[in-house]
A protein has these predicted regions:
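Conserved N-terminal entry element of GNAT/NAT acetyltransferase domains
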Residues: 1-15, 173, 178-185
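Short amphipathic helical patch at the helix-1/turn junction of helix-turn-helix
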Residues: 105, 139-140
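Conserved GNAT acetyl-CoA-binding A-motif
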Residues: 126-138
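Acetyl-CoA-dependent GNAT
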Residues: 8-11, 19-110, 116-121, 125, ...
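Conserved catalytic-core motifs of GNAT/GCN5-like acyltransferases
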Residues: 80, 135-138, 150, 155-172
């Protein structure tokens, strides 16, 4: 049996992270995002991921199974515009709130605990940086991701936003939860 683990990404992981994003968006999110958004994931996305990995304020984690990279997660401090309520008011704990910006597992590697391990390690990393709670934005129609975060104890906090993908509008719910997670699946 292969060993599954999570580690901090290195710049050399950028091409594999970009591949996972492309495959996952095409396989799991085509109906949500539309072809135009997926087509925009050109070769420059690898450079974007290399820059994200090197950025000192965030940590990119990768999930591996044996020799394969199967998923990734990005975590860091929540920017003010991400943590503010709809009126723009910041909560008292804004400076102690972490953001799970992206968490993707390639669909063929799903249901093996990779997402849970990624979220648990990202939450641990955020706690080590002083965060006390986390937030993440999830498409309202993405029932699989909403269920995943609910199992981790995260819930919608009433804040919504709408993103324009170029050919459709995507309504997202902001989820919030504690960072003392010990998830394995």
């Amino acid at each position: 049996m292969s060993t599954a683990r999570v580690r901090a990404a290195v710049v050399a992981d950028a091409p594999e992270i970009a591949r996972i994003q492309r495959v996952t968006w095409r396989t799991a999110y085509a109906d949500l995002l539309g072809e135009q958004a997926i087509a925009a994931l050109d070769e420059s996305i690898e450079q974007h991921w290399a820059e994200a990995i090197a950025h000192p304020a965030t940590t990119v984690y990768v999930a591996t199974e044996g020799e394969f990279t199967v998923g990734f997660c990005v975590a860091g401090p929540a920017p003010e515009d991400e943590v503010a309520n709809a009126s723009g008011t910041l909560p008292e704990d804004a400076d102690r709130t972490g953001l799970i910006a992206t968490l993707l597992v390639e669909p063929r590697w799903g249901r093996r605990g990779h997402g849970g391990r990624l979220l648990a390690d990202a939450a641990r990393g955020l706690r080590q940086r002083g965060a006390e709670r986390g937030i993440s934005w999830v498409a309202e129609s993405d029932s699989a991701s909403l269920s995943f975060f609910r199992r981790a104890g995260w819930r919608p906090d009433g804040t919504v936003r709408t993103l324009d993908t170029g050919e459709r509008r995507l309504r997202e719910l902001r989820l919030t939860g504690q960072l003392d997670l010990e998830l394995a699946g």
